[in-house]
Amino acid sequence: CSSDLHIYASHADEIACSRRTIYSYIDRGVFQARNIDLRRKVVYKQRKRKTTASLKDRSFRKDRSYKEFLEYIAANKSVYVVEMDTVEGAKGTSPCFLTMFFRNCSLMLMFLLEEQTQKEVTRIFDHLTELLGIELFQKLFEVILTDNGHEFQDRQSLEYSKNGEVRTRIYYCDPNRSDQKGALEKNHEYIRYVLPKGTSFEKMTDKTTLLLLNHINSEKRDSLNGHSPYEVSRLLLDNRLHKALGLAEIPADEVTLIPALIK
């Protein structure tokens, strides 16, 4: 199941009316599809997200607050800005996702973690550094904005490679202000179309995680003028990223964002 925008953008030359007209027909019952079948015709209430971190020790935030993030990107306008977060599975289970989102093209990266810990996040950073090389990592991930979660508080292990080279700059949102990285928070909706809240990730593998990711990145968006994050990222990011991580475009008519995708 794809969004109405994705379907319209993929078949605009075959549809002899506007999207507004199609909505009107659906309202009047002309088609079998109903309003409830359309994602954006159903009101989505975003959950409030509480940080799991203890902020008693704020040393990890020194020189890396949201205010300082804004100052840095204002002075360095050409840098890629990446938002980072984790997505939890069912309560009482360990596996979760580490997600990263490129603001300039809406491309998301997603990695399966065995547990929501600093050690696991650092493992992914080290893996990406080895896979891409330090120079490409520095180019793509110069600035990362995340929340105050316990899994992100060992800033040094994230900012420095195993060889002691600076690979990124980590900045932190203000406490309880997940909206400051709202683009990624909103993009998590696509994960929940396939893995609804409360679903365990224990049966997920790196392979099924990549499959889900490629479907998400292949869905066309209004915010990208009817293009998909994958399409735009091929123009704006170094394509060595796509090759190294196995990012691939799913044909428009095959994009599927329902639970059956990985069952």
State where each predicted segment sits.
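RNase H-like two-metal-ion nuclease catalytic core shared by retroviral integrases
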Residues: 146-148, 153-161, 170-193, 202-214
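C-terminal domain-tail junction helix/linker
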Residues: 197-263
